[in-house]
């Protein structure tokens, strides 16, 4: 007797099953078979699971489970990133909330780092617990934290090697500087936001009594102004930085200023003389064609400064106040207070020409929201030219494949325009740079201080202090493919399978970190191991909300995947979306929108429904609009699968089968042939990373072919007196269902395991879990001789669909029996009707089936056409005749529309000449079928 619950309730078994899988060690690499390795992009240890994580991890897990079932030695390497800046912010915030008066600075470096480790021990595994709830089948025993001893040793080794090879150097460059965090940050941590600002035009006087003839023209080329000027007009959005100007720049071919090449100007407010230089960088059509150059505070100006050997004047302190390089009256002012004073003094001097509104792209730190400064500071850098050249070769030679392939263009663009990489950060939490300085400022690099002293003969009397900076997190993340496999320690490499699991099989990640992480892993892995880090890179789109908006806390449109899985009340959802906002004033707007979209909160969908939704939405190369309605639909899909399994189990009580079914009915042969086709499609879709087509194929087979059709077609055989047909039908039901559960398992692991545990024993299967059962293969069943059965059942389906449509349109109650009259048809139709009479009668509630002779008068009837066969349901006692006339008119219009579509295609020379011959022929056959149907419908309409 089946013990399967009467209703689908994922909360009753999902967590239980995961605990069983993990305890049994099913996710640990077997060490047997061909290796298949997937790298998890390590999420921040501070983070919680968001929809982007859930999206990518679902696809990774499907790939891992699929290959595990195919006998591969699967390793899914997981772990977390120490997330330097984010972690320091979280711990600093927690210290403030504790109310003990402790701060980062009051604790000091060692005390603060100790607090970070305390926090990590208490809260650092949150995201891994959430990943388990999603169903990720990763080897948790190998979970790695980037600050663990092994990865930390890899970081030191990589730094020392690159330094000794001349690839790492210390120098003064412009970096993105966050004045709140007081550290350099990466480009990825900068958000460019369009904001309203101003463009100020300022007169810069020419030095040395130089003047020139200034001429202006209107749009038609007519001269509107001619005068002698002893100044140039410069436009800027940041007037405070003029205190650090070291040149004014013109285009060398700008006819307006040809006489001013090599002139000088007197910088207002400072009195400094700076040169007028020429450079092709200048856009002559923008503004006056004159540009101020501030090399220490603008990335483009810095490049100009390098080309022209200009001095660099840094105006700011680490907190973006004015330093000693500016005139004394500005020193100590905040940058925006300095701006006000500069503008006031320019106006007093009469050199502020114009102020007008201007749209700005303002760089803001993604964590603090502060305006980021291009800041001149001493940092550590990696020389990228040679590394990037090799990294590009590895991709263009095909050793690494991008999916979809168009992302190679993005990769190439970045690699061909690469700059040296700033790897140092002014933080405490992270991998401290393995460099020491003596009192004279000389630098020594080594794995530790003892090695440095021994290598350079430095006695204890020579004081050394370690660089206080840490490496940015991308430096350790670039080593992830091989540091997790024990590199550089030979014993650890042997124990963790370095030689077996590198390169990994595929990296699943987003396009936004192709450069920041993917490219750097390619370069570093090649540099340190001589191998590629992975064979394939599958680039996903970004998850957006149903309206296509980016999900963000500030917009209040974030969906927590665990809320979709387990459900959340509207009050809790509102509280989650409105707490911790950077702009608390947005809370009422967010609450209103949330209550409108989710008046009753979010119901529990279960992990499988979310996972199947993600797969179905995973189209190539597009951002994903996540619609919660799709998840509801796929929860219904899981429920339908549950109910179909209950039907099969209840109709196979006491039955035990082994081997492949020997089908006795056409319906069995049809479903087995369909199973073979969907199995082949499944393998092809996995090979091409087409998870959307995979979900579509499996959904179509499970819902339509198996649940809607085969289960219904099986009922007559199960209730028939032919015991052999009933037995083979039971065997086929169980066999196809068990195969379907295996096909679905990588996408929906929980419900398939729960159902499979009930189904498998009836087929003599003793494997402990579906996750280790072999994946179905095309050819598991020899369906080569089933073509005629397939055609017969497709005909039967057409008959049933046509008659059901008639019954529905006539509003005939499901239980009421009707007569069926048949007329015309092909030579195959009569024997088919005879063979399928019991199925037709059972499925359509037919009182009788009778044939009419050609030309025989027919009673007023509702008509349908299947091929050349006319199906008639006498209307007497069934329907209002006026309603039937309306129905026929509607059906005639529908068929006429289909004929119009066919004629449109066949009337197009482009279609007929360019489409495959088989497609054109298929369209002609469709036109013939529709024309036959229209003739029959018109004849029937004429009779009533």
UniProtKB/Swiss-Prot annotation:
Recorded catalytic activity of this chain's protein: tRNA(Val) + L-valine + ATP = L-valyl-tRNA(Val) + AMP + diphosphate
Source organism superkingdom: Bacteria
UniProt entry tagged with the keyword ATP-binding: yes
GO BP term (any one): valyl-tRNA aminoacylation
Signal sequence extent: none
EC number(s) on file: 6.1.1.9
Positions occupied by motif 'HIGH' region: 43-53
Residues that bind ATP: 553
Subcellular location: Cytoplasm
Name of the protein described by the UniProt record: Valine--tRNA ligase
